[in-house]
């Protein structure tokens, strides 16, 4: 779900609460490295999390939280087409793979990820 700075946050929060299950993730649409990202477990926290994300840019998305393993796969394009690197599993000590986990040593990576080849092929 998408919101712009200046929109009615109360109405937006009500829409999120009626359409998504908690937890949700509130993220700025600009930037990276998990700046401005908040994991929200209760609807009463939404407006504060959206305002926090607005510090990084004028638009914010709210996404359904999912549980499971954190897998990632880098890809690049060369003269032969799209190339993919091995799938990596990210294991975090934190509640989710946030800035602290990424840059302050609170995560580890397993490369290649210990997953079936069929799963790896689907990710790639």
Where are these regions (language model features)?
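Active-site nucleotide/adenylate-binding loops and adjacent lid/helix of ATP-dependent enzymes
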Residues: 1-63, 67-69
């Amino acid at each position: 779900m998408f919101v712009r700075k200046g929109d009615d946050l109360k109405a937006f929060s009500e829409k999120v609460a009626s359409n998504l299950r908690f937890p949700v993730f509130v993220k700025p649409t600009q930037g990276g490295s998990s700046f401005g990202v908040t994991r929200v477990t209760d609807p009463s926290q939404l407006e504060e999390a959206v305002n926090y994300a607005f510090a990084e840019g004028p638009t914010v998305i709210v996404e359904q939280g999912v549980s499971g393993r954190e897998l990632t796969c880098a890809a690049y394009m060369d003269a032969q087409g799209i190339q993919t690197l091995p799938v990596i599993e990210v294991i975090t000590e934190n509640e989710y793979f946030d800035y602290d986990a990424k840059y302050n040593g609170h995560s580890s990576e397993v490369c290649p990820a210990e997953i079936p080849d069929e799963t790896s092929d689907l990710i790639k």
